[in-house]
Amino acid sequence: MPQSQVATASPSQNAQPNHGMGSKVLSSDPNASLPPQTAYYASPLHANSVSLPPSHLPRSTLHPLLSQQQQPAQQSPSLGPAQQNIQQPPSVSIASQPHYAEAIVPIQQVLQPQQYRQLPPNMVAATNAPQQHPQLQRMMPILSSNQPIQQLPLPNQASPYIPVPLQQQQQSQPQQQPQQQQHQQPQQPQPPQQPLQQQQQQRQLHSGIQQPVSTIVSQNGTYYSIPAVNHPMAGQPIAIAPVPAPNQAALPPIPPQALPANGTPNTLASPVTLPAANSAVQNAQPVPMTSSPAMAVVPQNKTAATSTLAAQQGANVLPPNAPESVRHLISLNEETWIQIGRLAELFDDQDKALSAYESALRQNPYSIPAMLQIATILRNREQFPLAIEYYQTILDCDPKQGEIWSALGHCYLMQDDLSRAYSAYRQALYHLKDPKDPKLWYGIGILYDRYGSHEHAEEAFMQCLRMDPNFEKVNEIYFRLGIIYKQQHKFAQSLELFRHILDNPPKPLTVLDIYFQIGHVYEQRKEYKLAKEAYERVLAETPNHAKVLQQLGWLCHQQSSSFTNQDLAIQYLTKSLEADDTDAQSWYLIGRCYVAQQKYNKAYEAYQQAVYRDGRNPTFWCSIGVLYYQINQYQDALDAYSRAIRLNPYISEVWYDLGTLYESCHNQISDALDAYQRAAELDPTNPHIKARLQLLRGPNNEQHKIVNAPPSNVPNVQTAKYINQPGVPYSNVPVAQLSGNWQPPHLPQAQLPSATGQSGVVQQPYQTQPSVTNNNVATQPVIASTVPVQTAAPSSQTAVPQTIHQSNAFTPRGKHASGSRNSISSTKSPQHKLSDQPRSRNNSISNVSHRERSNSVSSKSRETRTSASNESDPKKSTQRDSSKKLENSTVVSGSPSSSSKSDAAKSIKPQKPEPALKPVEGTADPKSTKRNHQETEKTADTDVSSTEPVKRQKTADVNDDVGEEEVKQSVSEQVDSAQLTSEPKSESLPKSPEEKSDDTSNDVTTENTNDINGDSNMDNVATVDKSTDAVDTSTATVAATTTTAEEELPQKESQERSSPSPENQDSTPLAPKSVSPKQAARTLDIDENYDDDEGEKETVSV
């Protein structure tokens, strides 16, 4: 239709009626004789006011706006204005509305696929009163089949739907009632015409908002215009069809002669059923639909607002008075889209399937089958939050669907929300008619496994296998059961299951993964040779596998294995670090190997690297505490133990080590008993903890305050465990399964130190995620997929063996070459261990931790040492001079700078624990001792005091050991507990170098001061009286005899009673070397003061 004809219809340009339009009126009814009526236009339009069509409608399918409704009539010739006025029916109100039956034909009879219908807004809402619906004026334009169709916008709110001149002309001329057609209703009185303002308000009320576009639908040459309203959810326009009044019924189908040429009625492309806008008239809510899927797209990211909308609107989105044909059409469209989606799933086209299901939701936003299929696709894509939203929406509509509860529980499990997963599984068991669903029990088994309840997890998995022996996940269940049996120390059953799935491992695991698990089981059984063979078979396929190299390095570190080799172990671990230098466990194990080789500086550096990468691992801090203990830095050891306890207070070994520290340093027997009692609560089956408690609680416990240390020979009574690190991404390479109780295998009995106790089972594993304990499965277990759990799968972190420290690895087996000394080195008590330990600070952590202020040689210590050596043993003077030259000339290679030392100390230094170590009664005041040291250091030689201590010559240590071996003193009952307990209290504060005297207490104090300053063993010489020598030598002898086997103890004591002579007692240089309580207390005082100084330095720097 030419645009000029449209422009002439505007009242602003042409106030006269358009007589040319009358010649284009047609009627589809051959018997109709109704004359044409005046043209009816929606709004004034200018010649250039034709708007572009909306994006969802093709331009070729649009036509000019014809807001009139067609009346079936034959095509009549064009009439003039006079004939048109005469033939108009009288008393027809232009503003009145027609009945539904007169305004629109049934929706299922809409035929032409590229034509649309449209009604004016004042016809959208139908009232209950039939008299308010007069006959609508209709026109039938002539449109050729090849004529282009255009879309025009609806008028704005301020324009009338009928031009004012036409309204006046129609009101002034009498109108004639036309003859009723086949579907014509009886004539009813019309209300008076409403004012223009009321009409505008009514249109705004019915439409809600201004309509941007309109839709035109045609059937059999009749055009209907329906205004468009905004989408209630997405803000997009949708068309609204009128609803008949309650007293009106749907029209019958169109007879066959009225069908189009092809004879098949076509439905709308994709009608949408969404909640309609609120109508002012009761029982007149329109049925929402759209002509294009793009007009009402359901968002893919379904949010909680959809669930709220579902609860408010309900599943039934159609009004109660909607025609049955509309309901049927919507249902057919919904089922069709669902079938299309299922067909796309058969072709493995998930995107098309998802789009089809969303189209079904546009037909019915609360279609349970469509939402269920969408949720399943999202769950398979691991988009669990979106899947949870869809499942929750389904359960809002029907909360009794047990299958949906089961799927929801799985999604919660994958999100690591165990409490909600547990609740969902309970609801599933309650609502399912038959709870014997293998997938349900498979998920429940994974849930129990994540909770750490291995017994319940085992029962759930066995129930799943009994319900369906051919379950699709049967091999994965066998794998999980093998892991559970390994954690329960049922190694035979675990090996049987792993061998059963060796030929058919669950995907994506491979045969190498199963061999790795088999090797780990052999390692737990202490069959190290078979474990090494299994690991080497994996390493043959993956030569640079970090975890396999790590496990092989740890096997070579084991002293009980036949292939023990610390150098080879370090080589394996170094290769593991080359493959993955971010693994903290490899650094930790290298540190253990260096400690076994007594390379304490390198061990400290390795521990520091491990702490940098995993600072919240209590195992690392426990090992650092043992290292500090061995180099006599007791305050640092206490800090490290306290940090480990704060991270995980359920490690019995840490409490045992803490009790050893309290007992050895200050004789704090009450604190030691508390620590031992805590360790016994965590590990009640440990016989060594019980024996230590009985010894300290016995009637003669005062006798063992100094001499008796923790059990010297502590065997490994517990199997190795690993500590889990959850949340590691899955890997296809073989890695050992790490449960919550997994720990690296321990060292042999011969290397276990008496200071720290045995390796035991961790009752509460260390965790990095607080939500789950004993995390034994993957972070995202899969119920319906084939991906096995992550715990079974090898990963780059879960296979890291983390030990609860076994201090046996850190005890030096003796640096001395004498054969008699080697018999005691592996079983000596802490007192003998500390006495044998060289005092040279280059063997300690102090070089790295920047503690040169107390380790430097002071003038007081050198003067006192010189006087004491001259008085007691002139032979030691020459050795002292040589050692002094070494101190001034030799520097330890590889020691870090002072700044790096300070940073290293700050990086690992924890806060001081409670209770702090208490000084022994009768010892020197820490503050006064510090003042004396400071005054003495002021007079020290600058070159000598600033020189870093160096390692002593090995020959000097050998000479000391030979001298100690020659000492065979008799232990008499006269020098028992009375002398041991009274001697420390008789000592007095150290005097200044100027106040030299010959009394024994000053000499003993000077000796202890020399020990504090950290000089070599040969410098620890003092002149004591006869009674003091007897006490010291008896103390050393008792400490040595307690470290030997029980059956040899009586014989040794008898031999030692008869062997020593007075000359040996007087000449022994190592008798005072056993660390007395006073010496330990003073050492700690210096450390505590240093901590205060460091704190002040940090405050000033800030």
Swiss-Prot record:
GO terms, molecular function: chromatin DNA binding; RNA polymerase II cis-regulatory region sequence-specific DNA binding; transcription corepressor activity
Biased composition (Acidic residues): 1086-1096
Pfam family, one: TPR_1
GO CC term, one of those recorded: Cyc8(Ssn6)-Tup1 general repressor complex
Cleavable signal peptide: none
Keyword Transcription regulation: yes
Biased composition regions of type Basic and acidic residues, renumbered to the chain: 849-865, 872-887, 932-941, 984-999
Biased segments, Polar residues type: 1-17, 25-36, 85-94, 751-764, 819-829, 1002-1020, 1057-1068
Low complexity bias spans: 64-84, 166-187, 195-205, 889-907, 1021-1044
Keyword vocabulary terms for this entry: Cytoplasm, Nucleus, Phosphoprotein, Repeat, Repressor, TPR repeat, Transcription, Transcription regulation
Region of interest (Disordered), ranges: 1-94, 166-209, 739-764, 808-1102
Self-association state and partner proteins as the record states: Associates independently with tup11 and tup12 to form ssn6-tup corepressor complexes.
UniProt protein name: General transcriptional corepressor ssn6
Organism from which the protein derives: Schizosaccharomyces pombe (strain 972 / ATCC 24843)
